[in-house]
């Protein structure tokens, strides 16, 4: 989740929450965002995020790592809140036949509905994509003023 816009940048669904799943998700973030300048990834202290492979990859890409304090989920309140919303609005209301139907459902919820339609008070009652678009427009106008 981009904390500025509340946009879900990348997500993966797998049978196991292992280093491969984490690395695949992180690589997709880099692919979608392209520029990792000033990128900070904040996570809990799960073994996947504490691994040498993860830390080395982030260092090579110039990504700063931030960890929640041990036993303190409030340090990552935005994503904890998102997970609660995801469960309440979607997961608990659906029946998934298999892993593929779960993947499809998660894609539809996050990419099609959440990023495009779910409004947030913290970003002016806009959806994450609307907020990012308006931010880009303001940035472009500011650049034009400078030139």
Features from the language model and the residues they span:
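Electropositive, glycine- and tryptophan-enriched low-complexity nucleic-acid-binding patches
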Residues: 2-12
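Active-site beta-loop-alpha junctions of metal-dependent nucleic acid enzymes
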Residues: 12-34
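RNase H-like polynucleotidyl transferase catalytic core
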Residues: 41-45, 60-78, 94-97
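Acidic/histidine-rich, metal-coordinating catalytic segments
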Residues: 35-50, 69, 126-129
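C-terminal domain-tail junction helix/linker
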Residues: 59-63, 85-147
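Hydrophobic (often cysteine-bearing) scaffold residues that line and stabilize catalytic clefts
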Residues: 14, 18, 22, 50, ...
